Structures are given as structure tokens and as C-alpha cells.
Amino acid sequence: MAHFPGFGQSLLYGYPVYVFGDCVQGDWCPISGGLCSARLHRHALLATCPEHQITDPIDGRVIGSALQFLIPRLPSFPTQRTSKTLKVLTPPTTHTTPNIPPSFFQAVRQHSPFRNGCMEPTLGQQLPSLSFPDPGLRPQNLYTLWGSSVVCMYLYQLSPPITWPLLPQVIFCHPGQLGAFLTNVPYKRMEELLYKIFLNTGALIILPEGCLPTTLFQPIRAPATLTAWQNGLLPFQSTLTTPGLIWTFSDGTPMISGPCPKDGQPSLVLQSSSFIFHKFQTKAYHPSVLLSHGLIQYSSFHSLHLPFEEYTNIPISLLFNKREADDTDYGPRIPPGGLEPPSEKHFHETEV
């Protein structure tokens, strides 16, 4: 399900980007307005980022580093390739597979809305079958239930490519629910399982307050954040640099961030509004800020609900101006005749 290297189109802004291969994990890059993964030493930066410009070894275009994977990319188109460049530009595979007991998957199938080997959430769209492939391949996502919400645990990189800004660097997990699937497993073993997941992924793990009675799995050992959950929503936390993975619509309908269901289809749906794009026109806002304020939402379905009229006329200077890319404050600049910003009640912060 790999996407060939080539030129594509930005999912959000519509500008051309260069795609080297499968997308990878990353963080928000305020300089370029793209994504950057320092841990993996791979970058997802715009071709116009002044600090990361190099020449494409194939056709001489200015694109970025040879280890860069530009996100977003939708769609991607083939370009001239050689076996040498493909070897350099294709990301490595994951060489290990997590050891998850079969009873977990059996219980998920029993307690989840599985139909024909796929999960069917309330929005009526199918997600890939829950499974882990053979070692040497990238496992797909792991889905479970918490309350009335479907919870997705990203254990490894996605097998299909992902799109901006959905990042498998935050694991949103409820150990009690996980323990319900694993019979006769004490909490200490749950903590050890989570800690092993952290060691294999390097992900930040978000746990509900008071979920573990012991102190084995604490921030001193791994970057675990204990915080209150509100109907599956991850509250805003200034310490988080990536958005959480599980969100719900305003009416409480769960949304699941997952891989694209079919080859060539987007894994990200950005539900837009005019105010969101006024914010994007003025500042490269961090996606977690927009998420926490309820301004953007995610799901993993077939269509992209993004009216093109809302961003086709955005001046390029607003996207790449250094001052506008500075995300040190969250106060939007409303252009003349633009929409008013939301009231302060939309900007709640939750202390951890």
C-alpha cells in the first residue's frame, strides 16, 4: 500500500509538495508549517522552508533533505525514479511485532461492532481488520472500546501512510478496559505491557486519572500523563506537542483516527469552518491547539470534507512568513471584514 515518491498536493493548503514515500511520525515545524520528526531524524517540511532546502537528486528541484518525508501529501503522483533513489527515499520497515495475547483480539471482536472483519463505527464507515502482520512488516492499528467510544491504540507506525497532522506519537489508553480483555491479568502486568509499548514506540502515553493503583508506571519511568477524560476527549495540555488520537463530534459521535481504508484515499478528514481558515491564513497554528478548542476534528473515512473555496485564495506570503509561523501565542489576527474569533469560553485549558 505504499505511495510512490512524487509530487502531490497539500491536504490543507493545496500547495504542491514532494513525497518521498510512506509518511512517518513527526512534530509540528513552526518554521515551515510542516511536520518534523526529530526522534526519527526524518523531516516533513515544505519545499520552501529556507532552513531545509536542497536539490532533488532526480530532477534538480529544490525539495529538502534526502531523509525528508513531506506531509501532507494528497494525492501523490509517480515521477522519475531509480532503484538507487528509491532505496534512499523509502523508509525502513519495523522489524519487531508486539506480543499481544490472542485473547485481546478475540475480546475486541466480541465486544466491538465488527462486521465482515472490519469495525463499523457509528458514522457507517469501515476500518481495516484488526490484525498484526508477520515480523518485518509494519503492524496496523489496535482498536478497543472504552465506554461508548472506540479507542485506537497506536502501537507502531501505521502500515498505510498517514496524513497531516495525524501522528502516532500519543497513545490514548485506558488500562482498565485493556485489562477487561485480558483475563486474570493483574494491574502490574498491565503497567509492564504499557511500559513495553513505550519502549518500543517512544510514544507519550495518556492515562486517565487514578487508573493504576500502583506506582510502577509513572512519569519517572516513562512519559505517562495522568489526566481527566471527558467523553473520550483529551483536554488541552500545554506540554503536549502532538494532538491526541481519539476525538468525538460535538454531538458525542466517536471519531477514529486510523489508516486510509483503500489505497490512494486519505486517512484524515478535516471538518472545516470559515473561522478555522481565517486562523490558518494568519498563523501556522499547532493542530493540538485547534483540536483542544474544538475548531478541527478528525476521522478516518473516504472523503475530504474541505470546501476548496475556503483556502484557494490564501496568499502564499501568509503561509511562509516567519512572523506568521511563530506559534508562541494563540491570538488570531482577524482580517478586515473577517469573522470574529470565538469567545473566551472556547479556550479552556485543563491543568494536569
Swiss-Prot record:
Induction of its expression: Down-regulated by P30II.
Region annotation (Disordered) ranges: 327-352
Keyword Nucleotide-binding listed: no
Region annotated Transactivation, chain positions: 288-321
Compartments in which it is found: Host nucleus; Host cytoplasm
Domain of life of the native organism: Viruses
Annotated segments matching region Interaction with CREB1: 2-57
Region annotated Interaction with CREBBP C-terminus, chain positions: 311-318
Sequence segments annotated as region (Interaction with CREBBP/P300): 80-94
Keyword Ribosomal protein listed: no
Motif PDZ-binding boundaries: 349-352
Record Pfam families: Tax (PF02959)
Family in the record: Belongs to the deltaretrovirus Tax protein family.
Function description: Transcriptional activator that governs the viral transcription from the 5'LTR via the recruitment of dimers of host phosphorylated CREB1. Together they bind cAMP response elements within the viral promoter and mediate high-level viral transcription. Increases host CREB1 O-GlcNAcylation to further increase 5'LTR transactivation. Also modulates the expression of cellular genes leading to the deregulation of T-cell proliferation, perturbing the integrity of cell cycle checkpoints, the DNA damage response and apopototic pathways.
Quaternary data: Homodimer. Interacts with host CREB1. Interacts with host DLG1, IKBKG, KDM4A, MAGII3 and TAX1BP1. Recruits the coactivators CREBBP, EP300 and PCAF. Interaction with human CARM1 enhances Tax transactivation and promotes methylation of histone H3. Interacts with host SUV39H1 protein, leading to abrogate Tax transactivation of HTLV-1 LTR. Interaction with human CREB coactivators, CRTC1/TORC1, CRTC2/TORC2 and CRTC3/TORC3 enhances Tax transactivation. Interacts with host UPF1; this interaction inhibits the host nonsense-mediated mRNA decay (NMD).
UniProt name for this protein: Protein Tax-1
Biological source species: Human T-cell leukemia virus 1 (isolate Melanesia mel5 subtype C)
Gene: tax
